[in-house]
């Protein structure tokens, strides 16, 4: 079997060089028998005392060969011959009894009860070889303690998930001389974890990892969240906190070297990818992201199918997922976490820190009556009824993730018996939309949740109307659960059987839904009282302007009336003027003037006339009148008269 892990290759090279294998030194192969990937029995899990002892023997042989005074070629020949003999001795398989191996496997299954798919031949051979290597060398507890110490020696302390500087065993150097014993145990554990190749989540991860996880769970209190560090170069998980065992059931090191998106539900992978692609440009533009700047969203993560929870029927059991709220934080990789062979393109060396918190159902008992202090969540939908936004707080109350609701019609979640109530509610929404910022609370109604039950909601409705087109843009409902569902766990799968409704009821419900959508698409009219107020305000402004204009015209007419023969006056009352004109030595002239206005009044005027000897004369007269109205009027009279001797009569007409 050829190794598919870059980490195991590098570690195998260093181990083979340390052990002095002639095969690996002379051929330059990247795989060796000691790594466990070359088809030979693995010796990584054996005691480190034997390796150190062989190294000392080889060093003495080298010194002895150098001290003999022979040539460099002869010394190299002797060293190669001795190491080749040792390599042949190491490659011989160790004898083992079949009955003893079977007893050890049964005893291990009874004690550990950890791992998933024990039916695979590769996992069985690996367990047999581990039991053979461990017999007479060291106890299980000592080996686990050595693994923990080696991990602690290669790791950095983590005060918080936001300041992660831990380097996994694969990222450190594999050829250190001073840490040979710790590296051997750590590499053995890491190779066992990688032995289950990508995609085989049900395979064994090694007895050491299982024992370490069991010991850690017994010593500490269970946590309800976990964190992991992901490389943004290839999406590989570099580190996970031990609490992942309590939350999802996975051994601590099982995620290392795997892609994080493989554990995300298929329907949520697009959401996860969009959050990543959105967060990377923001982090690069800011240069350094503050610690409190997080991107939060919800996904479903895969739960571990172990033998402890479901017995040996791993393959027959379905894969289960649980909802989690993920907090993303982008950070630059520390210098200690960048080995020489870790090449990053375009100068990017970013790490993604994910803090996952499980989401639990909000209900404890069936048909629970919640208090008024229960948290609110908002759902926004367009005028066509399509949901466009959902708060993450709705997940624990409804069981849906936001991406499960967005793009669906909100009419499908209303109870069929409450559609008439919802029609009245949307009528009120359209009326309240005439006033900007108006809101109201509707009657309680039933809403469908993820497990197939209904909850009773109390909603405060608001809407936004486009001020230019007078069209409804969207409706926002701030919901609060008044009564819980009959089934407390909102994340359970909905029943396959649907509620039976008569065809008449279905047609009626369809008609009501269509009426609601048509009503929301109508133009929102302005209220009549608002129109009246605007007209009254405009009339008052126009009347004030006209009064000012008439006052100016009246003053100009009074000044020009005494010298003119014909005057046009604007007045706001009715007046009647009678003028008498006397011409020459006895001529008389009379004139009448009328004016129209908004008021009534009477006025008197005097007229003067001149006559010639022939008996003709002209006369002009002006008359003013006052009335009970609010204005004053001016009249201008002119008259002409004819006479035989000394008198003339003339008439005058006032033009308003």
UniProtKB/Swiss-Prot annotation:
Ranges where the record places region 30 X 2 AA approximate tandem repeats of G-[TN]: 584-644
Entry note about domains: Contains a remarkable run of alternating Gly-Thr residues which is polymorphic in length. At least four types of Gly-Thr length exist in the natural population, (Gly-Thr)23 (shown here), (Gly-Thr)24, (Gly-Thr)25, and one minor variant (Gly-Thr)21. This Gly-Thr stretch is implicated in the maintenance of circadian period at different temperatures. Deletion of the repeat leads to a shortening of the courtship song cycle period, and thus could be important for determining features of species-specific mating behavior.
SMART domains in alphabetical order: PAS
Xref: InterPro entries: PAS, PAS-like_dom_sf, PAS_fold, Period_circadian_regulator
Biased segments, Gly residues type: 584-642
Phenotype upon changing residue 165 to S: In strain: SI-LI1 and SI-LI2
Pfam families listed in its UniProt record: PAS, PAS_11
Stretches forming Sequence repeats: 584-585, 587-588, 589-590, 591-592, 593-594, 595-596, 597-598, 599-600, 601-602, 603-604, 605-606, 607-608, 609-610, 611-612, 613-614, 615-616, 617-618, 619-620, 621-622, 623-624, 625-626, 627-628, 629-630, 631-632, 633-634, 635-636, 637-638, 639-640, 641-642, 643-644
Positions of the PAS domain: 224-359, 377-483
Recorded superkingdom: Eukaryota
Protein name as catalogued: Period circadian protein
Cell compartments where the protein resides: Nucleus; Cytoplasm, Perinuclear region
Any one biological process term the GO annotation gives: entrainment of circadian clock by photoperiod
GO CC, alphabetical: nucleus; perinuclear region of cytoplasm
Chain positions of motif Nuclear localization signal: 53-66
Compositionally skewed regions (Basic and acidic residues) per UniProt: 108-120
UniProt keyword terms in alphabetical order: Biological rhythms, Cytoplasm, Nucleus, Phosphoprotein, Repeat
Disordered: annotated span: 1-161, 580-656
